[in-house]
């Protein structure tokens, strides 16, 4: 190196000088045992730089005349026979189908590196039991030489490194020329792969002592034209197709990848270094479009018939060169270490993915007999060869940035497993060219964190999160459909298939068209909207069901209501029956009791009748004694003085018990005729209607006149005897007039004067005067005095009843007390008081009249003494009320003051004493 400014070069240079002796360290060749023997020179050269090396006596640190490509060439491979199956884990004696040199210039992803190494991520043993044990890795110096060579050409010499294509074997491998070998594969896909232009029969014939330098061999055998400038005529292709179908040559790794359905065209690991960032989207193409092209190309290559490869010699710019072409700065160890932190693979063991994918491939090969598909594929290849020189160099710049990115190394397992009855592809272990060393992968794997792969999680479709995130950003819905649909058993999947960046543009266009058609077929059909008639019918059905539901509900509710009403009616009938029965029983009992009572009543009635009959009989037997008694009771017992006023005389007549002519004048029956005439003259003058103003004056005067006509004369007096009393007409007239006068006097006596000029009557009651007034404070009934007035509440205090006591009779005076004129005075009366608040005042007379009056009263009248006492008490106070017309004149007097009045008077007396 010319300078050490780049830190990556420092890093690589230090690695180269760490272990210089490792370049000559002998190790077991991965190709040992292929043809039976291997020379010692080959044993020492293979683990170092491959089958083409510098002289063995030179040290690697100071001699590198013309290093071979650090990675696999593009079109032709060196060092392996057609039937060799070699891996880094060791050689196998299994035969493999013919494999072809690399024909594509597309970059190789990390998944393809793993596939070429035949290693499963996270496992240290081969996937199949027939694989031998793993051999040691190549020395680190060889890995460093590979990377050093890459940086040497790209940085130090500033050389536009390109891939070279050789039409002849390299020095020392002349015996591995093109040969025709028959296929021993049991699968159709390996028979479909054409024979290479030159093949290897083994590495045992390599001449280690060959003096031919690699530079001379390269100048001699390298092609003079680049792959871009190489033109294959359409006629030659057509002629070749007639005799032998043309097919681009494939490498052993591509054969295995095709068997695994992972790839269709292999890529070199060197081209992987030219990838750019993975998440950048190609301009004008959506993310995920490259994957569609890969899938289409995988289907195309898997169904294509064998085509004989065309060996082309390509020389870039007239000078061959051994280093690969890189369009961008390759990755350094720092970049790889930094990216490995973000793109870790899953640590789950791979459960033989190669066998499962070969099963899928064997089922997909059943479609190879379709002639239309074969013709379509061959036409595409002819168009590819025809337009190889006309490809626009800007197509490389339009490549999707996802393809230029370092693809994540993962171990994706196909979720769908085919039936066991399908014919599996033969087990083929991918052979790795000695130059295609796995040192790059080993370094990356050593830089990878173990915890990083352990915590990696896969998404639902089996991709790691980073790749899933890239494909989830697809702008086309069809991309998601193709990516997520894993249920199609006839679809061939490829996780790392890429279209060649320098390939035919028409192929890309065809692939895009086919992808669009696939997307169009897989697009879900738009759901047809119902018409207005369907909507109307559905609405009508909904309304009908709605109405029917409510109708059912109403019918159910009505039925329940009827049932409940019937139950209530039944309960009523039951209750009525019980009540009727109980009432009937009770009625019968009452009838029986009434009959018993009737019997007792009849008995008592008969008894009373008998008693009265006996009494009547006794009265008949004592007739004579009764007549004598009647003679003695005829007239007054003693002579009564004549009354001084008409009122007193009328009152005496109304209360007289013995009613005859002698009682009217107040004389005895044995009086003289002169006494009768004298009393007649005085009484006629006293009760004369012309002079008397009482209400019953006419009746009283008539009574006096009839009595005088009965006994005023001797002849009439002799006829008015006790024997003829019942047959005397004058006596009957006397009794009739007397009754009329009594009525008139009682009516006048019970009439109460009022200012309203209406007539108010007092009504006699059966209340005893001794227990007349009820007292609320004492809880007992006090006796009532003459003319006392009190009030009682009835009907829950709603009505008031006023009473007064006169002549030892309690009268109801409510009509007079509730009159409009009297209400103002009596409305404040308190009911059920202990003391009497008001008293009723009667008309007064003079002492002479009173004395004369008292003389005419009957001694048997109970109220005579009471009236006299009352009149004597009130004579002085109410002298102005004397001689009034009414019989029942009333006045008020506070007989007993109220309690508050007493307290007020006592306070006044105390105040006077203080003064």
Curated annotation (Swiss-Prot):
Comp. bias regions, Basic and acidic residues: 1-11, 289-299, 351-386
Region spans: Disordered: 1-48, 122-142, 267-300, 338-399, 474-527
Keywords: Chaperone
Start and end residues of each J domain: 660-724
Chain intervals with Polar residues compositional bias: 22-47, 494-505
Biased composition (Basic residues): 510-525
InterPro entries the record matches: DnaJ_domain, J_dom_sf, Jiv, Viral_replicn-host_int_reg
SUPFAM superfamilies listed in its UniProt record: Chaperone J-domain (SSF46565)
CDD domains on file: DnaJ (cd06257)
Official protein name in the record: DnaJ homolog dnj-5
Species the sequence originates in: Caenorhabditis elegans
């Amino acid at each position: 190196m010319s300078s050490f400014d780049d830190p990556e070069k420092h890093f690589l240079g230090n690695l180269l000088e760490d272990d210089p002796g490792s370049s000559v360290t002998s190790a077991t060749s991965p190709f040992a045992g292929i043809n039976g023997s291997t020379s010692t020179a080959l044993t020492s050269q293979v683990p170092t730089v491959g089958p083409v090396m510098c002289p063995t006596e030179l040290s690697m640190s100071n001699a590198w005349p013309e290093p071979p490509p650090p990675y696999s060439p593009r079109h032709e491979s060196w060092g392996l026979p057609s039937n060799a199956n070699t891996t880094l884990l060791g050689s196998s004696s299994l035969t493999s189908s013919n494999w072809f040199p690399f024909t594509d210039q597309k970059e190789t992803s990390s998944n393809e590196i793993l596939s070429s190494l035949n290693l499963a991520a996270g496992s240290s043993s081969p996937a199949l039991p027939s694989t031998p044990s793993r051999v040691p890795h190549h020395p680190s110096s060889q890995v460093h030489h590979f990377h050093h060579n890459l940086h040497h050409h790209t940085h130090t010499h500033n050389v536009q490194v390109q891939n070279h294509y050789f039409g002849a074997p390299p020095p020392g491998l002349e015996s591995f020329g093109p040969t025709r070998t028959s296929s021993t594969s049991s699968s159709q896909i390996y028979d479909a792969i054409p024979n290479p232009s030159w093949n290897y029969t083994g590495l045992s014939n390599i001449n280690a002592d060959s003096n031919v330098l690699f530079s001379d061999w390269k100048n001699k055998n390298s092609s003079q034209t680049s792959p871009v400038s190489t033109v294959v005529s359409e006629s030659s292709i057509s002629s070749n197709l007639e005799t032998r179908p043309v097919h681009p040559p494939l490498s052993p790794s591509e054969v295995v990848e095709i068997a695994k359905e992972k790839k269709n065209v292999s890529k070199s690991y060197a081209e992987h270094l030219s990838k750019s960032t993975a998440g950048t989207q190609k301009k004008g193409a959506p993310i995920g479009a490259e994957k569609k092209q890969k899938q289409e190309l995988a289907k195309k290559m898997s169904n294509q018939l064998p085509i004989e490869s065309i060996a082309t010699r390509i020389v870039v710019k007239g000078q061959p060169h051994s280093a690969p072409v890189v369009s961008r700065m390759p990755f350094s160890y720092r970049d790889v270490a930094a990216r490995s932190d973000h793109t870790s693979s899953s640590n789950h063991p791979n459960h033989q993915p190669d066998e499962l994918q070969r099963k899928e491939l064997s089922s997909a090969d059943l479609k190879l007999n379709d002639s239309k598909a074969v013709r379509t594929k061959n036409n595409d290849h002819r168009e590819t060869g025809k337009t190889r020189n006309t490809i626009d160099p800007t197509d490389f710049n339009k490549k999707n940035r996802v393809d230029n990115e370092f693809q994540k190394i993962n171990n994706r397992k196909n979720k769908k497993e085919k039936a066991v009855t399908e014919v599996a592809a033969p087990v083929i272990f991918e052979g790795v060219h000695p130059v295609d060393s796995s040192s790059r992968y080993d370094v990356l794997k050593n830089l990878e964190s173990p915890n990083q792969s352990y915590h990696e999680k896969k998404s639902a479709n089996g991709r790691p999160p980073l790749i899933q995130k890239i494909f989830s950003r697809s702008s086309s819905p069809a991309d998601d459909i193709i990516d997520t649909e894993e249920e199609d058993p006839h679809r061939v999947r490829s996780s790392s298939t890429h279209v060649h960046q320098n390939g035919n543009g028409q192929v890309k266009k065809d692939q895009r068209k086919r992808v669009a058609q696939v997307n169009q077929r897989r697009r879900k059909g738009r759901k047809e909207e119902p018409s207005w008639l369907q909507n109307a019918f559905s609405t009508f059905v909904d309304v009908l069901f709605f109405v029917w539901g409510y109708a059912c509900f109403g019918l159910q509710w009505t039925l329940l209501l009827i049932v409940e009403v019937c139950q209530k009616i039944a309960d009523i009938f039951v209750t009525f029956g019980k009540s009727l029965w109980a009432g009937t029983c009770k009625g019968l009992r009452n009838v029986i009791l009434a009959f018993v009572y009737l019997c007792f009543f009849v008995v008592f009635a008969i008894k009373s009748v008998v008693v009265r009959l006996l009494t009547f009989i006794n009265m008949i037997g004592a007739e004579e004694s009764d007549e004598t008694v009647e003679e003695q009771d005829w007239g007054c017992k003693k002579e009564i003085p004549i009354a001084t006023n008409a009122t007193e005389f009328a009152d005496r007549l109304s209360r007289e018990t013995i009613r005859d002519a002698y009682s009217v004048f107040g004389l005895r029956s044995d009086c003289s005729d002169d006494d009768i005439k004298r009393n007649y003259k005085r009484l006629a003058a006293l009760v004369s209607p012309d002079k008397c103003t009482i209400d019953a004056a006419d009746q009283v005067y008539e009574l006096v006149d009839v009595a005088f006509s009965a006994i005023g004369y001797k002849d009439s007096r002799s006829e008015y005897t006790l024997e003829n009393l019942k047959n005397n007409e004058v006596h009957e007239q006397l009794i009739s007039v007397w009754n009329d006068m009594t009525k008139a006097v009682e009516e006048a006596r019970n009439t109460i004067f009022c200012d309203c000029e209406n007539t108010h009557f007092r009504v006699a009651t059966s209340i005893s005067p001794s227990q007349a007034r009820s007292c609320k404070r004492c809880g007992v009934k006090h006796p009532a005095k003459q003319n006392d007035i009190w009030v009682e509440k009835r009907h829950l205090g709603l009505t008031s009843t006023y009473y007064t006591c006169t002549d030892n009779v309690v009268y109801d005076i409510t009509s007079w007390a509730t009159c409009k004129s009297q209400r103002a005075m009596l409305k404040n009366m308190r009911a059920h008081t202990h003391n009497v608040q008001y008293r009723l005042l009667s008309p007064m007379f003079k002492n002479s009249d009173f004395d004369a009056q008292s003389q005419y009263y009957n001694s048997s009248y109970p109220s005579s003494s009471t009236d006299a006492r009352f009149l004597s008490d009130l004579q002085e106070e109410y002298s102005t009320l004397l001689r009034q017309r009414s019989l029942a004149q009333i006045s008020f007097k506070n007989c007993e003051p109220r309690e508050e009045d007493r307290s007020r008077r006592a306070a006044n007396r105390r105040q006077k004493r203080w003064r």
